[in-house]
């Protein structure tokens, strides 16, 4: 099992990842930036106001965080930063499907 990713916390870190590759999924968008240092992967979560009120956005964020923690962190590439932009469908998706989709996007496969 790989080590758990660290969190992206600062606005500048989130903006830097926007320059990287974008991998679109049905339930979310994953933005990926290779830092080039081979260190522990870092991940940040964003859910826009288009998704719903604060309660709904936090539920989407919590589901994505748990999917990464339980399963998808093993598929993250060391030295990469990831920003996961949650979509409305992430709230209604079966958890197994959400985990599988995250793993595919982290590996860069369709």
Swiss-Prot record:
Protein name, per record: Ribonuclease P protein component
Species name: Mesorhizobium japonicum (strain LMG 29417 / CECT 9101 / MAFF 303099)
EC number(s) given by UniProt: 3.1.26.5
Keywords, in A-Z order: Endonuclease, Hydrolase, Nuclease, RNA-binding, tRNA processing
GO cellular component, one term: ribonuclease P complex
Catalytic activity reported: Endonucleolytic cleavage of RNA, removing 5'-extranucleotides from tRNA precursor
Keyword Disulfide bond included in the entry's annotation: no
Gene Ontology BP, a term: tRNA 5'-leader removal
Keyword RNA-binding: yes
Family: Belongs to the RnpA family.
């Amino acid at each position: 099992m790989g080590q758990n990713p660290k969190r992206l916390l600062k606005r500048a870190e989130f903006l830097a990842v926007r320059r990287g590759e974008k991998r679109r999924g049905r339930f979310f968008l994953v933005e990926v930036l290779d830092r080039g240092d081979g260190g522990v992967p870092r991940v940040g979560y964003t859910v826009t106001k288009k998704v719903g009120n604060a309660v709904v956005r936090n539920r989407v964020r919590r589901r994505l965080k748990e999917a990464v923690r339980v399963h998808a962190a093993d598929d993250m590439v060391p030295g990469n930063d990831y920003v996961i932009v949650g979509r409305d469908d992430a709230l209604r998706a079966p958890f197994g499907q959400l985990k599988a989709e995250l793993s595919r996007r982290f590996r860069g496969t369709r």
